[in-house]
A protein has these predicted regions:
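Short beta-strand-to-loop junctions in surface cap/lid or active-site-entrance loops
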Residues: 1-11
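Short, proline-enriched alpha-helix->beta-strand connector loops that line the catalytic pocket
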Residues: 11-12, 147-153
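Conserved strand-to-loop "acid loop" that flanks and positions the catalytic carboxylate
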Residues: 20, 155-159
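Short amphipathic alpha-helix
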Residues: 29-30
Length: 159
């Protein structure tokens, strides 16, 4: 599945980031609900390769999609679902996305890690390994939350 970008005159754009085993189709119902009310809308297809793609690499790809669709300076709102929320935070906190983001929504994302990532071998599934409790990536993200205080953040999680 390819990247999907729907445009209109209203701003700011909304970027939706899918999770580990998902595609942009996971947002079809949300897209229908937003029809006509929230555009431009960008839903990039990130090649997560069942967790083989490192999370930072996915965040770099996300940044490339955002820049290609909206340039370098257009403010955006960002919503990440599941692993997409962690990918979004990497882009925000480690790759400069905070400077252009107005709001960040994390839905069902393992921001503190998940035990389900433990059994997978790190050398093969580095993206999944990044989601382990206490991983170097999550420690780095959670060790410096000051930048997130400059934007409106919402986290929704259910266990």
């Amino acid at each position: 599945l390819g990247e999907e970008c729907v445009t209109s005159d209203s701003a700011p754009p909304l970027v939706l980031v899918h999770g580990l085993l998902d595609t942009p189709a996971v947002f079809n119902a949300l897209k229908r609900e937003l029809a006509g009310g929230r555009h431009p809308l960008l839903i990039p297809a990130l090649p997560l390769r069942l967790g083989r793609t490192p999370t930072m690499e996915a965040a770099e790809l996300l940044g490339g999609h955002i820049e290609a669709a909206f340039g370098r300076d257009q403010p955006i709102d960002l919503l990440g679902f599941s692993m997409g929320g962690v990918i979004g935070r990497c882009w925000l906190q480690l790759l400069g996305g905070l400077g252009r983001t107005r709001r960040f929504f994390s839905v069902g994302s393992p921001q503190q890690g998940t035990l389900t990532a433990r059994p997978w071998p790190s050398r093969v599934f580095s993206g999944i390994a990044d989601l382990r409790n206490g991983s170097a990536l999550l420690e780095r993200l959670n060790g410096d939350l000051d930048g997130l205080q400059r934007i409106e953040c919402h986290s929704f999680y259910s266990a």
